[in-house]
Structure formats: C-alpha cells, structure tokens
C-alpha cells in the first residue's frame, strides 16, 4: 500500500519485520500459505496546525480514509490514530470555520449547514465503531471536545502523561456534537459523564486511567510506541476472533437513531442563539491556545 497524504492528515501501512504471524486461518487472501506473514496495521496521522481542528477539509479526508480502510481487511489487523502536532491529539471542531459558516450563511439556513456536517462526522465515527479492525488512539497533550470524541470512538486509548481530556463545549453555549457523550457513558458511570460535561474541567492521563477511559499510560512522547506494541500484539491473534470479540463487547451502534437525532437537533438549536455567536466571536478574536484550556 502506498501512503496517502493530504494537507490535514495522511495514512500508511506499517509492517513489523521482526514479527512473523505464521500461517493459518488469518492468512490474507492471495498470500502464499508458505510465506511468513508480518504484523501489519494502518496508521492515520493528523497533522493540521495548530491542533488538528476538524473542519471541512479534515472531514473530507476522514471520509476518504474510511472508504479506503473498508477494502483493507484482508491484511490489516488494527488502525492507530495519532497526531504529529506538538500541541496535542486534537482540539475538536474547527470553531473558526464554524464562526465563518454562521457569519456567511443566512440565519434560517445555519442549522441545515451545521446539521450536514454533524451527520457526516457521525457516519465517520460510526465506521470506526463498526470496523472489524481494532482501533487505537495514541494521544498526547490537548484531547478536547471533538478530539476527545474521536478518541472515544476507538477501541483503546493509549495516552502519554501530557494528555488532558475535556468537554469544554458548554463554555461556548454548545454541547459535544460528535456522539462523545453516549460513547463515554458506555465506558464510565453517569456521575463521571455529568462531571466532565457540566463543569468542562479537564482531567489528566492518570485520572483517565483510573476512570477506565484510557487503557495504558506512557511516558511523555511514548504513546505511539506503546500503541504500536499493542497493535503488534493484536496482529498476532486470529483476525476473525478479534472482530467477533470486538462486536460482542462493543456495540456497533452506541447511538441509537433516536439519540443521534436528538443530539444533532439540540446542537443545531443551541447554535442558532446569539450567545453562541458572541462566544465564537470572542474565541476567534483570541490568537492564543489558551481558549482550549479549561
């Protein structure tokens, strides 16, 4: 597989030459039964400064990635989602783009524009849930809002000690809109969800590990190496059994259609308020990353 590169993200095949998978029921179609197989996975790298904000360009590329991954089940065993941006994994939705959309779209059409975006990102993250491949988020630094929601759509989160997690959307008069709350509810108790949502406070990697949000914590800068170790271990297992176990443990649809519609409806309703427009205006006027930090 040749690497694919866009301005906002890229993906490539990673093969561990030191690991032989042998042969057997997991042998990919077209592979010779006598040829030792190597542990292989796909790495999706986010690289949009300042902190991988998810706007139209990133969403377009994510949709391309999901379409691509659907044809790679024969050889891939896992997907690692990572960031090359020093500030962190992902700061969430591109609020500047949202602000521009609200400025240039007629008031009565704003909800429809936002709704289309949300429905598309929901489909992308639902594909992560439904994929037979194990998905691993390797996170560091800022993992806020929509970035937190992307990580929650993965089967495992591996974080380094610099990682911080938060849902700061209520500070803007909004709610998380990428399905993160239902996904969080399947991992932790209701009181934890309410605390993170209603206070907007951030938690560090150690606290996330205690709560069960994170599976492992690495030294600063080592999350990707640890995630690769996990992918290497998963790649040694029978792929059919891995997919079956994932489907059994993790619901394919953490959001019912009713929940998804209710979340999107509420987000769009809140988006129409003057208070949200004012909050976005204030955010855009800042040239600092400080608004990301609760």
Tell where the protein language model's regions lie, with residue ranges.
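Conserved CoA-thioester-binding segment of acyl-CoA-metabolizing enzymes
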Residues: 1-21, 25-27, 31-84, 126
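Terminal low-complexity tails and localization/encapsulation signals of metabolic enzymes
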Residues: 1-9, 280-294
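Glycine- (often His-adjacent) and acidic-residue-rich active-site loop
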Residues: 83-123, 143
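Short helix- or helix-capping micro-motifs
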Residues: 91-93, 184, 192-201
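Glycine-rich beta-to-alpha active-site loop
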Residues: 120-172
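Well-ordered beta-strand positions
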Residues: 156, 195, 199-201, 207, ...
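C-terminal long alpha-helix characteristic of the crotonase
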Residues: 158-163, 214-262, 269, 291-294
């Amino acid at each position: 597989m040749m690497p694919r590169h866009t301005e906002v993200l890229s993906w490539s095949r990673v093969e561990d030459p030191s690991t032989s998978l042998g042969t057997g029921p997991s042998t990919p179609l077209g592979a010779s039964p006598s040829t030792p197989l190597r542990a292989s996975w796909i790495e999706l790298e986010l690289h949009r400064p300042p902190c991988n904000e998810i706007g139209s360009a990133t969403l377009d590329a994510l949709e391309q990635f999901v379409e691509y991954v659907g044809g790679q089940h024969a050889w891939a065993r896992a997907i690692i989602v990572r960031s090359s941006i020093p500030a962190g994994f992902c700061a969430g939705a591109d609020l500047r783009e949202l602000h521009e959309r609200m400025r240039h779209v007629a008031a009565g059409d704003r909800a429809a524009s936002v709704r289309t975006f949300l429905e598309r990102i929901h489909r992308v993250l639902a594909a992560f849930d439904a994929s037979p491949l194990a998905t691993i988020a390797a996170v560091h630094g800022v993992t806020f809002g929509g970035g937190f929601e992307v990580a929650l759509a993965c089967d495992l989160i591996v974080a380094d000690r610099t990682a911080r997690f938060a849902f700061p959307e209520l500070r803007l008069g909004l709610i998380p809109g990428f399905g993160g709350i239902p996904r969080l509810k399947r991992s932790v108790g209701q009181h934890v969800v309410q605390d993170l949502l209603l206070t907007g406070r951030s938690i560090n990697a150690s606290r996330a590990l205690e709560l069960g949000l994170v599976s492992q914590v690495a030294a600063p800068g080592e999350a990707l190496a640890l995630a690769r170790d996990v992918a290497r271990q998963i790649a040694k297992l029978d792929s059919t059994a891995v997919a079956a176990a994932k489907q059994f443990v993790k619901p394919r649809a953490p959001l019912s259609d009713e929940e998804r519609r209710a979340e999107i409806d509420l987000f769009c309703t809140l988006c129409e308020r003057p208070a949200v427009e004012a909050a976005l205006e204030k955010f855009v006027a800042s040239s600092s990353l400080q608004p990301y930090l609760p």
